[in-house]
Amino acid sequence: MSPLECSECFGDQLLHRTYTWHLTLHSRPNFTRKRDTRSESLEIPINVVLPQRGTAEPFLRLHNLYPTPRCARQAALPRLSRRVVSQHSYPLNRFSSVPLDPMERPTSQADLELDYNPPRVQLSDEMFVFQDGRWVSENCRLQSPYFSPSSSFHHKLHHKRLAKECLLQENKTLREENRALREENRMLRKENKILQVFWEEHQAALGRDDSRASSPLLHKDNASSLEAMKKETALQAHRGRENSTLQLLREENRALQQLLEQRKAYWAQPDEKAASTEEIKPISSPHEEPHGLLPDPGPGLPSPFEEPKGLPAPPDDSKTLRALREMVSTLSAQPGEEVGKGGPGLPDGSQSLELLREMNQALQALREENQSLQVLRDENRLLQEENRALHALREEHRLFQEENKALWENNKLKLQQKLVIDTVTEVTARMEMLIEELYAFMPAKSKDPKKPSRV
């Protein structure tokens, strides 16, 4: 039964719903003839089929216009003389208006030029079309009711399936390749994070070394800033050294002042004794003492020229203290000369003070030179350690890059090998299928394989 014969015959299908309109065409009376006022009408039933979910767009059906019904159900239905419209009518937007002549014979589908689309349903990956009272796959759709499928159709279907399988296999390989690339990117991100941590630690170490001492070999761009920092540190160290030197000089001056006070007190005692015994003689000044007034003291008495024990002496200035003791011993070895000279004794004390200061300055200069040499040695040692660490890091980074390159090439070769294996497997499967098809077309006798004759 053709889809154009009767739409009521398809009412039992669950995949569409049918709405019917009865279109009546009236012809005007012919006024050319006298008293001929008859009007003729033609009733055309039109069906609109609304597909359910999963089907194509709505389509139009047209009833049979022949006088005799071509379907048993259509013959059993009563004919309506007027237009019947369903409660749930659908707009007739697929109907193409064509001038119809009611005097002619009933027109066909080609004469009406109606746009007809058969119903379609898509299930999984296949499309089904309703044709000749049954649902048929779109790939297996018949062109006419007398069409008989041939082997070429199945061959085409088989090729389509093979193409679909090839596409699925290719998609699978692409997904695997994408997975491998994602894994490789994840590993590279981890390696970059590790290298970044190493680089940050190295930069922090370089910053600490720069704060200690400048490194012109590694930081040529920051030479000016490092020089300024070095100058500031040198100025601070020099100021600290000057402060320590001033402190030492103050302590030495304090010790010398105490020594002079002790000498003055010791010289004043014999003057008082001489004044009490000999009142006639004038009181001599402490600077005009006789030569025999300063004998060597006893073994239990301390010498007035010895350095007091309570004086603070830094442990690092042993040479300075030794020189000071030598100067004090030289001063104590010449007491008679100072007494004989009398008045010029004080200038000699100032000269000894000046000599001590000069010696202290020379010792401070030597100590500063030694400290600067020690600082330079420490800087050189730190620079050598930094160079060794940098060389080790560069070597490790180079080995790491070579290892990454080898891993990447290995992964690439594995992917290529897998693609080749898949291609060979696919070609082998196709060859087997072709051999089976050839055996299917061959007669029964030739199906038995024969051994090839030896030449």
From Swiss-Prot:
Positions of the UniProt region annotated as Disordered: 267-318
Phosphoserine carried by residues: S41, S86, S89, S97, S124, S144, S148, S150, S211, S225, S276, S332
Keyword Zinc: no
Basic and acidic residues bias locations: 270-291
PANTHER family documented for this protein: LEUCINE-RICH PROTEIN, PROTEIN CHIBBY HOMOLOG 2
Similarity section: Belongs to the chibby family. SPERT subfamily.
Name assigned to this protein: Protein chibby homolog 2
